[in-house]
């Protein structure tokens, strides 16, 4: 059994979606492989990024079959929501889920490939990058717009924020890995805490907190202190987990 949804703008590549397991297996253009795997696959002149989610354990095969939406489905639905809010994310093409013996098995999310310059990691780590400060300030404005639209990306790490030039030749941003998102009102601390996973140095932290303070119209020092506390809390938690696992 399969379940799927295909964006109406891509009806001409329905065959690609329905046979994605074969196309994925026979393609060697892997761009990321960890828990999940991403490949760039061209079909009928469209460059796509196909994300194959890891088959879950037996308990979660039951959970995803009957009680919870899959990560592939949430990725697609969240992409549609973002597009409706005019927030950049690669164009969603569709998702598909495969079931065997009434259990959830493989799942895939397909989007159009976005050509980008680099991830936000580059300006955050490279102080000599051209237009660094401009990019970071625009990134803060982009994030503020997410929060203003009640969008909270729960995996807002540097590798999930793509930097590109838009049609006006201005720096712009696009978010990926969007299956874990919440749509809710975002208060000041929650908004600043959203930056913590970027693993900021002192200079970037102050610049981001200062710019965010201007946008939300609060005292800059207050904003810096809140983000510092969020940053320390996350780094301490990660360090604690490393020690528990014996990775000093």
Feature-to-residue mapping (PLM):
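C-lobe/activation-segment region of protein kinase-like
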Residues: 170-247
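Proline- and acidic/polar-enriched loop/turn elements at helix boundaries
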Residues: 94-95, 158, 168, 225
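Juxta-kinase regulatory segment immediately upstream of eukaryotic protein kinase catalytic domains
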Residues: 1-28, 241, 245
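Conserved kinase catalytic-core helix
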Residues: 72, 78-88, 121-159
């Amino acid at each position: 059994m399969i379940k799927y949804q295909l964006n109406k703008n891509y009806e001409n590549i329905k065959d690609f979606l329905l046979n994605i397991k074969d196309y994925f297996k026979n393609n060697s253009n892997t761009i990321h492989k960890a828990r999940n795997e991403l490949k760039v696959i061209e079909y009928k002149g469209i460059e796509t990024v196909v994300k194959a989610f890891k088959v879950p354990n037996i308990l979660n095969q039951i959970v995803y079959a009957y009680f919870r939406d899959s990560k592939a489905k949430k990725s697609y639905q969240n992409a549609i929501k973002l597009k409706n809010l005019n927030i950049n994310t690669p164009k969603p093409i569709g998702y598909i889920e495969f079931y065997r013996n009434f259990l959830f098995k493989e799942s895939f999310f397909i989007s159009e490939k976005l050509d980008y310059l680099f991830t936000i990691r580059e300006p955050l780590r490279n102080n000599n990058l051209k237009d660094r400060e401009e990019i970071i300030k625009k990134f803060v404005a982009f994030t503020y717009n997410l929060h203003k639209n009640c969008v909270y990306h729960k995996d807002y790490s540097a590798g999930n924020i793509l930097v590109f030039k838009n049609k006006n030749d201005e720096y712009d941003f696009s978010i990926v890995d969007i299956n874990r998102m919440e749509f809710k009102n975002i208060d000041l601390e929650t908004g600043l805490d959203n930056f913590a996973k970027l693993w900021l140095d002192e200079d970037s932290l102050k610049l981001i907190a200062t710019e965010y303070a201007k946008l939300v119209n609060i005292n800059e020092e207050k904003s810096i202190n809140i983000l510092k506390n969020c940053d320390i809390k996350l780094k301490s938690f990660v360090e604690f987990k490393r020690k528990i696992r014996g990775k000093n």
